Amino acid sequence: MTMESGTRPARRRVVVTGVGALTPLANGAEASWQRALAGESGISWIERWDPGDFPVRIAGEVKTTPELPWIDAKAARNVARYARFGLAAAAEAIEAAGLDQADFDHTRAGGMLGTGAGGMESIVEMTRTFDARGYGRVSPFFMTTFPHNMGSYHIAQAFQLHGPNATISTACATGAQAIGDAFDVIRRGQADIMVAGWAEHAVFPLFVASFIG
């Protein structure tokens, strides 16, 4: 980008054209929004694991495990839960925006995904395997499961987003920052389309214990 001395580059208008969500309230942005408007709560008893003697046994837990028809079945087996949430939400947003992959320049489309915990649960699970059965039982695919950047990678790979791509990790602000950074990328003219948001899976024993310990 170039600009003459004393002038500023024109700022492009940026608009949101599609929204997706997978929440404790519902699978889908519209259903989640309607239930929120109706005063329903996404907080419920933890079901995916037994909290035992934990003093807190409720959480905002996503009950479902999204299927991943957008990626290879073998690859899907090694996608961390948080990344599954991100893929499902991204797919809904792309569909809601009416984006046809044949109709846009893939080098001008990118993604920004925020996550705080990333695939931490995958680390916990593989550590158990390592402790119980030794190094020989550690999956060679482990290194493609837990990293924070894998969620953003899977979205870019599934929907052929070959433009700017990044992973943001700034705790509870990460989703807002990812959307803000994507906004800036478009406004600066570095991309025409950005898929941006936040994906998190934090309702597992170690993470919950860290908040109540």
Region locations from a protein language model:
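ACP-dependent fatty acid/polyketide chain-elongation machinery
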Residues: 2-75, 97
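Basic side chains
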Residues: 13, 74-77, 81, 108, ...
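Structured loops at beta-to-helix junctions and adjacent beta-edge loops in soluble globular domains
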Residues: 19, 114-116
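A glycine- and small-residue-enriched flexible loop/hinge segment at structural boundaries
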Residues: 48-99, 121, 148-162
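Acyl-thioester C-C bond-transforming condensing/cleaving domain
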Residues: 2-11, 27, 37-43, 95-107, ...
